[in-house]
Amino acid sequence: ANNFVETVDNSANSYYVVLGLTNPTSPTVGFGRSTTWNTNTPSPEDSFNYMNNAGDTQIFGKKVTSDNIRRLITRRNWAQGTRYEMYRHDYSIANPSPITSSSRLYDASYYVMNKNFNVYVCIDNGSSGISTTGNASQDEPVFTDIEPSRAGESGDGYIWKYLFTVPPSDIIKFDSTEYISVPSDWPTSTTTQIQSVRENGDSTINNNQIKKVYIDQQGFGYTQNQTGKEVDIIGDGTGAKVVIDTDSEGKITKTNVSSGGQGYTYGMVDLGTLGTPSTRAKLIPIIPPSKGHGFDLYKELGTDKLLVYARFDDSTKDFPTDTKFAQISIIKNPTSIGSTATFTTNQFSSVNAIKVISPTGTPTIGEKIEQTVTGGTAKGYIVSYDTDTNVVKYYQDRSLVFNQTTGDQTDYVGVTTNSKMLNFASSADKIIASTSGFTASVDQNFTGISTNPTGNKVISLGVNFESGLASPEINKGSGEIIYLDNRPLITRNSRQKEDIKIILEF
């Protein structure tokens, strides 16, 4: 996940969320299409052929920036009466977490988000070797102090450590019923709250690494009725100490870390000053990640997922509002049309366009259009028709030239001319739609990037036209498709915006 974020931040790269495939059910099935697409949407195929066809049917794309990416963790809302697991560094197959039986920390229920979108890690849940599941949580943590604390006066035994608050802007973009979004720039953020938590978690400065010593076995026969006996935590770090209490039988009943120390990856409690027991105790210093709780948030919470956000609205003619789409993809480093240079602009149109005159009828989105040209017939599928500007947008994919009966490379009559993918021409030959009755002529006299059809308002067309024709802004098939998802067909309109949220797991 971190590597992906870094590559997006790298100015040498350009990532785009792309919408495509206006006609997933017709007029020709095969080539990734299906008559039952909307009721039984197929999964994308993992093949170069499938990806190439998806590239042919792209409509438009919007650039991904670091502002539109967040690391994610599984959402766990605090709920009264729920037992949560405490953070431990040693969950494994041999030592699964006691409530969820997780063999790794990141699957355990060791953090929560409260009603205010504050996120906390559980330092203590009142558990021990004789009560491994701990207590039910009764007090919702709401504090934002940087030191671990109990959340209320119920005596539930919980100690919580505040980590961060999801800001309102991230709630709007990245909120999900399944995931919590994590701040994007934790190691470098100068936001006061984040900086305070991060710096407090640096035990090389604060000598506060270890927060909890877990009583796995109480032992028996240590010095009786000890209160506040401070002993050392020894290991590969330095400076940690814990205060021990014992009962009338010499059992260890309580531990309280008085100095967290620094530099530990393991530790043992030195009980040599508490007498000679008949049964020895087992106390486990819980080792935080990195330098301490809150210092390296991504490591502490296991942020192995990302959410990529993009909003498509009607603010530009690159995103026509009358189109449909059934595929969503992320592509890396498409190249500018007619060039090998990486496309870097905020958005692109990946379809061809025709400025028409004398239209009759209204075309259907997704239907085939044709024009007689030199060498045969140009063909395409309509993506959009703007009645204000008289601009037809279309794409061309291999289904237009393959065998129309078998939907593949089977030989057919007329293959010599019909299998050629020909471009539409700026000529007097009409554009004719296959089913709707729509016809129109190419506006051969139109050149430019804007039009003023009523004489009162200049409308930007998004792409530059030459003699009535416009090319895509990226080279067909350029860029690497790193994510592809099929959806039931979605119809756009001028009153809606599409918020696309893509979850990537690493």
Question: What kind of region is each of these model predictions?
Answer:
Residues 1-205, 280-282, 371, 376-380, ...:
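Tryptophan-rich substrate-binding surfaces of secreted polymer-degrading and adhesive proteins
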Residues 156-506:
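Conserved, function-critical positions that sit in or immediately flank catalytic
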